[in-house]
Amino acid sequence: MSEAKRIKTALVSVYHKEGLDEIITKLHEEGVEFLSTGGTRQFIESLGFPCKAVEDLTTYPSILGGRVKTLHPKVFGGILCRRGLEQDMQQIEKYEIPEIDLVIVDLYPFEATVASGAEEQAIIEKIDIGGISLIRAAAKNFNDVVIIASQAQYKPFRDMLLEHGATTSREERRWFAKEAFAVSSHYDSAIFNYFDGGEGSAFRCAMEDQKQLRYGENPHQKGYFYGNLDAMFDQIHGKEISYNNLLDINAAVDLIDEFDEITFAILKHNNACGLASRPTVLEAWKDALAGDPVSAFGGVLVTNAVIDKETAEEINKLFFEVIIAPDYDVDALEILGQKKNRIILVRKEAKLPKKQFRSLLNGVLVQERDLDVETAADLKQVSEKAPTAAEVEDMLFANKIVKNSKSNAIVLAKNKQLLASGVGQTSRVDALKQAIEKAKSFEFDLHGAVMASDAFFPFPDCVEIADKEGVKAVIQPGGSVKDELTFQYCNEHGVAMVTTG
C-alpha cells in the first residue's frame, strides 16, 4: 500500500447521523480515538464508546449560538500539520496539538432549507462555516488525512475499513479528497445560486471567463458564453461573435474534425449545406459551394486547410458570416478582411472537452462526445451485392455528414461531394424526398450516388425511393426489427447496403 497511514484520531461532527454507527463501531475496534462536538459526541457516547469534546481540547465552549465550535488552531493545526515536515511537528508538540488523521463531517442542509420555503434568516443560518472549513483543510492535507465529507462516502469508507482496517493508502486519501472538493464546490454553488436567483436548485457550471453576447438566440433574450474561446480560436477580424454564430461554429468544428483529407464545408443553422473533400482547398471550396449555392448565402465556412490567395478570391464572391481555418496566407487575409463585419477565425489545436452538456427541464444532460469515426473495417455488409471500393469511400464520407446533421437526416453524396441532404424532418421518407428534390434542383445526377441515414430504416420505402433515382449503395446503422425487409429489397434489386450499428 503506497504511503500507508494509520488512523489514530478521528474528528467527527455531522448533521446527519444515519449510517454512522457502523463506521464508528469499526473505528473503535481498530483502536481509533474520537473527538467531537455537541450532538455527535452524544451519539458516539450512546454507542458505548468514549469521545473527547472539542471544547476540552480548545478550552473554548461553543459560542455565538453554535456558529463557532471547531474554528480553533488546536483543531485545524491537528488537521493541517504535515507529518513529514519537522517544523510542523515541532510546533504542534510545542502547542500540545494532537494529530487528527480522519475527519468525518457533513454540511448543514442548505438546499433543503431553501426548498422548504424558509425565511432568509433561517436559510442564512444553514450556511455552514466550520464544516466547510474542516472539509477544505482535511482535503488539502490528504497526504496525511482522510476526509469523509458526506453520507455518500460512508459506504466506500466502510468497505475500505472492512478490507484493510484503519490503514489508508495515498490513492485512497486522494480519492476522498477529490470527492470532498466536489461536495464543497456544489455547496458553494448552491449558496451562490440562492443569492443570485433564489432558486436553490439551479445549475452553475464550474467555468470562468464569462463573455456577454450581443443577445441570445433572439434579440429579446440575453446571452452569455462561459468558457475560454481564446483557447480555441484567434479572431483576427470581424464583429463580435453572436450566440447563433457560436452554435454554427460548434457544429462546424464537430463536422470538420471528422475529416483527414482536405475538406471544405458550408453550414447553415448547424447543418452542412455544402461539403467536399478534394486534393486542393480551392477545389474543395468550389465543389462544396456547388452543393447548394443558394443556402450558402450568409453561412459559416470551415476548412481544415490553409486558405491561399486564389481560394480567398473565390470565397470573397459570397456573402458569409464566419470563416474558420487553421491559417491564412497574408494575401488571403487581406482579401477576406475587406468586409469589416466578416468574422475570421484561426482554429487552434486545443482539444474539445470529452463530455457534452445540454440543459433541459430543470436539469442537465451529460454524455460522452462521439469521437468514433467509422472505417471500412467497421462496416457490415448486409446485402448480397458488395459495394465497390469507390462506393465504400463515398458511404464513409456521407456517414460523417449525416452523423453531424439534425435528425431525421438523409445525405446523398457522390465522389466525396455532398449532393444534397434532408435534415430535421419528422419523417425519414420526407427527409429523403427533400434531399432528392434539392439535388435535382442543382442538376446533380444521382446515378452512382450513395445514401446515408442517421438511423435505421423501419421499412424498405426509403431504399426503394432512392433506388428508383439511381442510388445503388446505402449506409445506415441498422437495428430495426424489420431490417430483413430492407435487406431483402436490396437483394432483389441489386442495391449494396452496409450497417454501422
Labelled PLM ranges:
Residues 273-293, 417-463:
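Glycine- and Gly-Pro-enriched alpha-helical subdomains that act as flexible
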